Amino acid sequence: DLKTIKALLPYLVAFTVPEDRDSEDFWMSDYDLYQKIVEGSYKDGFALVVEVSNQVLATALVSFRDEILSGNPSSHLEVIVVHPEYHGTGLAQNLLEVCENRAKEGGAHCMTLHAYHKNTRARSFYEKLNYCGEFLRYRKVL
Protein backbone atom coordinates (compact mmCIF):
# COMPACT_ATOMS: atom_id res chain seq x y z
CA ASP A 1 0.00 0.00 0.00
CA LEU A 2 1.56 3.27 -1.12
CA LYS A 3 -0.04 5.23 1.73
CA THR A 4 1.81 3.24 4.38
CA ILE A 5 5.08 3.52 2.47
CA LYS A 6 4.56 7.28 2.11
CA ALA A 7 4.00 7.51 5.87
CA LEU A 8 7.33 5.75 6.50
CA LEU A 9 9.47 7.82 4.10
CA PRO A 10 9.69 10.98 6.25
CA TYR A 11 11.76 8.94 8.73
CA LEU A 12 14.55 9.16 6.12
CA VAL A 13 15.05 12.72 7.35
CA ALA A 14 15.88 11.97 10.98
CA PHE A 15 18.42 14.79 11.08
CA THR A 16 18.41 18.59 10.97
CA VAL A 17 18.04 19.87 7.42
CA PRO A 18 19.45 23.23 6.31
CA GLU A 19 17.09 26.19 6.69
CA ASP A 20 16.82 26.63 2.91
CA ARG A 21 15.70 23.02 2.42
CA ASP A 22 12.32 21.39 2.84
CA SER A 23 12.60 17.98 4.51
CA GLU A 24 10.00 16.60 2.08
CA ASP A 25 12.45 17.24 -0.77
CA PHE A 26 14.65 14.50 0.68
CA TRP A 27 12.08 11.77 0.07
CA MET A 28 9.34 12.89 -2.33
CA SER A 29 11.21 11.79 -5.49
CA ASP A 30 11.65 8.37 -3.87
CA TYR A 31 7.90 8.18 -3.37
CA ASP A 32 7.47 9.00 -7.06
CA LEU A 33 9.71 6.00 -7.89
CA TYR A 34 7.59 3.74 -5.67
CA GLN A 35 4.51 4.90 -7.57
CA LYS A 36 6.17 4.08 -10.91
CA ILE A 37 7.14 0.61 -9.69
CA VAL A 38 3.56 -0.07 -8.56
CA GLU A 39 2.22 1.21 -11.90
CA GLY A 40 4.71 -0.98 -13.75
CA SER A 41 6.28 1.96 -15.59
CA TYR A 42 9.68 1.65 -13.86
CA LYS A 43 11.57 -1.50 -14.80
CA ASP A 44 15.14 -0.52 -13.82
CA GLY A 45 14.91 -1.43 -10.17
CA PHE A 46 12.94 -3.05 -7.39
CA ALA A 47 11.28 -2.26 -4.09
CA LEU A 48 11.10 -4.46 -1.02
CA VAL A 49 8.66 -4.02 1.85
CA VAL A 50 8.81 -5.71 5.26
CA GLU A 51 5.29 -6.01 6.59
CA VAL A 52 3.92 -7.78 9.67
CA SER A 53 0.21 -7.86 10.51
CA ASN A 54 -0.53 -5.18 7.91
CA GLN A 55 2.06 -2.83 9.42
CA VAL A 56 4.97 -1.72 7.22
CA LEU A 57 8.12 -2.00 9.33
CA ALA A 58 10.69 -1.19 6.65
CA THR A 59 11.19 -0.65 2.96
CA ALA A 60 14.03 -0.40 0.46
CA LEU A 61 14.23 0.77 -3.13
CA VAL A 62 17.09 -0.11 -5.49
CA SER A 63 17.71 1.05 -9.04
CA PHE A 64 20.05 -0.41 -11.63
CA ARG A 65 22.44 1.95 -13.43
CA ASP A 66 25.96 2.03 -14.78
CA GLU A 67 28.64 2.83 -12.21
CA ILE A 68 29.65 6.48 -12.58
CA LEU A 69 33.41 5.93 -13.05
CA SER A 70 33.88 2.45 -14.50
CA GLY A 71 30.63 2.19 -16.43
CA ASN A 72 30.17 -1.35 -15.07
CA PRO A 73 26.66 -2.58 -14.27
CA SER A 74 25.80 -1.27 -10.83
CA SER A 75 22.95 -0.75 -8.41
CA HIS A 76 22.02 2.25 -6.32
CA LEU A 77 20.24 2.10 -2.97
CA GLU A 78 17.67 4.86 -3.35
CA VAL A 79 15.91 4.21 -0.04
CA ILE A 80 16.25 2.10 3.04
CA VAL A 81 14.11 3.12 5.98
CA VAL A 82 12.97 1.30 9.11
CA HIS A 83 10.19 2.46 11.41
CA PRO A 84 11.87 3.93 14.54
CA GLU A 85 10.22 1.32 16.79
CA TYR A 86 12.35 -1.32 15.03
CA HIS A 87 15.70 0.49 15.04
CA GLY A 88 18.46 -1.63 16.52
CA THR A 89 16.75 -4.94 15.72
CA GLY A 90 18.95 -5.86 12.76
CA LEU A 91 16.08 -5.31 10.35
CA ALA A 92 17.92 -2.67 8.29
CA GLN A 93 21.03 -4.83 8.01
CA ASN A 94 19.00 -7.86 6.93
CA LEU A 95 17.00 -5.82 4.43
CA LEU A 96 20.16 -4.30 2.97
CA GLU A 97 21.71 -7.77 2.63
CA VAL A 98 18.65 -8.95 0.68
CA CYS A 99 18.93 -5.86 -1.55
CA GLU A 100 22.63 -6.52 -2.18
CA ASN A 101 22.00 -10.17 -3.05
CA ARG A 102 19.14 -9.34 -5.38
CA ALA A 103 21.20 -6.60 -7.06
CA LYS A 104 24.10 -9.01 -7.54
CA GLU A 105 21.71 -11.57 -9.04
CA GLY A 106 20.55 -8.79 -11.38
CA GLY A 107 24.11 -8.32 -12.65
CA ALA A 108 25.31 -5.43 -10.49
CA HIS A 109 29.02 -5.35 -9.68
CA CYS A 110 28.56 -2.92 -6.79
CA MET A 111 25.98 -0.92 -4.88
CA THR A 112 26.19 2.81 -4.31
CA LEU A 113 24.12 5.07 -2.08
CA HIS A 114 23.88 8.64 -0.89
CA ALA A 115 23.91 9.66 2.75
CA TYR A 116 23.46 13.22 3.92
CA HIS A 117 26.64 14.38 5.67
CA LYS A 118 24.78 15.31 8.87
CA ASN A 119 23.11 11.91 9.03
CA THR A 120 25.85 10.38 11.15
CA ARG A 121 23.67 7.45 12.21
CA ALA A 122 23.19 6.33 8.60
CA ARG A 123 26.81 6.95 7.67
CA SER A 124 28.00 4.87 10.62
CA PHE A 125 25.60 2.07 9.65
CA TYR A 126 26.87 1.97 6.06
CA GLU A 127 30.53 2.15 7.07
CA LYS A 128 30.00 -0.73 9.51
CA LEU A 129 28.78 -2.75 6.51
CA ASN A 130 31.92 -1.92 4.47
CA TYR A 131 30.54 0.92 2.38
CA CYS A 132 33.18 3.59 1.84
CA GLY A 133 32.73 7.26 1.03
CA GLU A 134 33.99 8.33 -2.37
CA PHE A 135 32.50 11.73 -3.21
CA LEU A 136 31.61 14.84 -1.30
CA ARG A 137 29.01 17.09 -2.91
CA TYR A 138 29.16 20.84 -2.36
CA ARG A 139 26.24 23.22 -2.77
CA LYS A 140 25.84 26.99 -2.65
CA VAL A 141 22.55 28.88 -2.58
CA LEU A 142 22.57 31.62 -5.21
Cite the ranges covered by each PLM segment:
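Conserved acetyl-CoA-binding loop-helix of GNAT-fold acetyltransferases
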Residues: 79-82, 88-101, 124, 128
